[in-house]
Every structure is written in C-alpha cells, then in structure tokens.
Amino acid sequence: MARFRGSITKVSRRLGVALAPKAEKYLERRPYAPGEHGQSRRSKISEYALQLREKQKMKFLYGVLEKQFRNYYKKAVAQRGVTGDNLVKLLERRFDNVVFRAGFSPSRAGARQLVTHGHMLVNGRKVNIPSFLMKPGDAIEFREKSKNMDAVTESLNKAPESRIPSWIQVDKAHQKAVFLTVPEREEVQEPFNEQLVVELYSK
C-alpha cells in the first residue's frame, strides 16, 4: 500500500502535534503552521475544519491512508459500543502499532518497516502485514536471524518502562512481547478527539 512520503515535520506543525519523535524538537521551537504567515494564522476555524484536522491527526499518527481509515470507521460502527472508542481500539490493535508500543522501535514508521521487511513473528509465524489485528494473548518476537539488531536494542534501552502500556507485556532480554488485552479508550493517551472524526463521517 502507498505511504506518505512528504515532510512529517511540516505536517506536525500544521496539525499542531508531533506525529513522530523527530518532529518534537521542531514543534517546540516553532509551534505554529509552516509558511510565511504561519505565526499569524489565528482566524476562527470552522467545525468542519476541526473535524478534518482530528481525522488527519489520527491518520498520520497511525500511518493509515484514507481508504483503510474509512474501513476502520465502518468496522467501528458495526461493532457494539461507542463508535469512537471502537475506532481507537482497532487502530491500537494494528501489528505495527503493537511493535511500536512494545518499544521495539521509537516510531510507528520504524515499526512498520520491521514488520514489512519480515523481521517479526506472531505466535511463531512470520507476519509482514502492518494492519494485521492482534488478539489478546498473541505473542510477538523477532525471527532468529533478526534478533539483537542494533536499532532494536537501542530502542529498547531508551524506552522507559512508563512508556510501555499495561496491555503489553515486554521481555526486553529476549526481545519478546505479549498483547495482553485490547486497551480501554481512557488508557490510550494520544492527542486527538475521535468523536469529531465520527461526526465528520456520520454526516
């Protein structure tokens, strides 16, 4: 599937949120939209623009393009419960997201590369599909020939225990993890309002 190839830093500044670790320092230094008039853009934003911005945040944060994102929304609507909560839970169950949450990569983009390049196993079988949805109890680990890669070891060493969520159990020494349970919405700390996205799609 095609992926975004533009400047993630510019998109982060436009949306007002760091979409990747490398964008954090730039956003701290220039917390306004890019361009000549970025600092002066203070006009009132419309309801539609707010909804669209929240959708863009979610898509870029999880690395999902429009068609797939809309499919997640349709699945969320079909499930029992709150549609917005269901949408977030589906995105959190993505294989590349779980690899990122486990600390195997400092970014979701990096985690997606680990998956697509065939470095990862799920329950002992190679899975190279980033959108593969994890189920409670699923175990992830590296293929034998991919273990102890420098980038992974460095990421695990830098990842504080507080960053690894309670719904993922990580064995840093053996570079393994278990997806314990689907997180509740309040456990997912991300800078977006999914309810505005639901309102946008339900029009």
UniProtKB/Swiss-Prot annotation:
A single MF term (Gene Ontology): rRNA binding
Alphabetical list of Gene3D superfamilies matching this protein: Ribosomal Protein S4 Delta 41, Chain A, domain 1, RNA-binding S4 domain
Keyword DNA-binding: no
Gene Ontology terms describing biological process: ribosomal small subunit biogenesis; translation
Keyword Nucleotide-binding among UniProt keywords: no
Keywords, comma-separated and alphabetical: Ribonucleoprotein, Ribosomal protein, RNA-binding, rRNA-binding
Residues in S4 RNA-binding domain copies: 93-154
SMART domains: Ribosomal_S4 (SM01390), S4 (SM00363)
Disulfide bonds: none
GO cellular component labels: small ribosomal subunit
Organism superkingdom: Bacteria
Entry similarity comment: Belongs to the universal ribosomal protein uS4 family.
Subunit text: Part of the 30S ribosomal subunit. Contacts protein S5. The interaction surface between S4 and S5 is involved in control of translational fidelity.
Job description of the protein: One of the primary rRNA binding proteins, it binds directly to 16S rRNA where it nucleates assembly of the body of the 30S subunit. With S5 and S12 plays an important role in translational accuracy.
Alphabetized HAMAP family for the sequence: Ribosomal_uS4_B (MF_01306_B)
Name used for this protein in its record: Small ribosomal subunit protein uS4
The organism of origin for this protein: Prosthecochloris aestuarii (strain DSM 271 / SK 413)
